[in-house]
Amino acid sequence: LPTSVLATALAKVLAERTMAQCVGRGLFRYASRPLRTTGTWRTPRLCLTLRTLPDGNLISDTHAASELDWPEFHNGVASALEIGTAHVDSSWIFAHASASRGGRARHAGFLLGLGLHGHLRRLGRVHAYRYLAPRHVLTTVGLVLGLGASFLGTGDAAARQVMAVQVAAFLPPGSVPLHMSTMTQAAGLLGMGLVFCQTDHAWTAMRLASQLDAPMVDTADANEAHRDAYAHSAGLALGLVYLGRARRTSMSSSADHALLERLCRAVATPLGEASGMAVARTAAASALALALLCLRSGRRDVAEALAPPTPANLAHIRPDLLLVRSLARALVLGDAS
């Protein structure tokens, strides 16, 4: 192959390696850099340009701009995680907003990272809605999940309102449809689960359970776009609301029995490719919900529902479903002592 072709291929590989380093960088440097709130926090953009030797040529544009959105998002998360103990206010956070495409993606991740530190508790409502108004998907995802992490398990009314506006299923009957993207609504569902984590909030759990097998989602996307993310977010959120409930309580009420029966029935339904994407999607989401709801409870009835009926049926279960069910079963039967 020509040298130029090999160099371009190498540049693409090195660029992908650079993009993948962001998550590890955030963990390695967690809370390691001091912050002066009188200045701004610099998040360097991803440098994917390669210089070849000995001719010194520069190779860039190995990836389209759209392919860099999520890597820049994770770059922003990693940068925020490096912040040490500090007190930041709403104006300081909003001052870091950027108008460029890469800058917006980085700042969206920066919001999520600040939320993981708990700093978004201080984000004013006016600034929050100024972030949401442009309907930039990554910014909304970062803000909603960051708020969920900052208000974890508090049931905060203001945070709940921000989540509910993103999800059509949580709007009051007769509301004007907002046509949010499916990814935005998936983030809203998961954010709702974080805000109400381990609160056993029955109404929220009921709304989340209804989205596990929702046939249609009021969205600006094509109906099937990101539907797996939407269903899985609903399952995780439902499990978070009832986190460890089977271990903390006897789950003897009729509502608890009905929920467990519904989830177990959904998990056990699909066998093989002919079962359809929608059924398989619901099964995976239900398994995730069961894993968190019955976390370390030792419930044998739930574990049996998650396991294949016979070893022969292993050949008839999709590999991704088998992975989720095996993981869920292990979490249910984990040491509950």
Each language-model region and where it sits:
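Alpha-solenoid helical-repeat scaffolds
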Residues: 1-285, 289-337
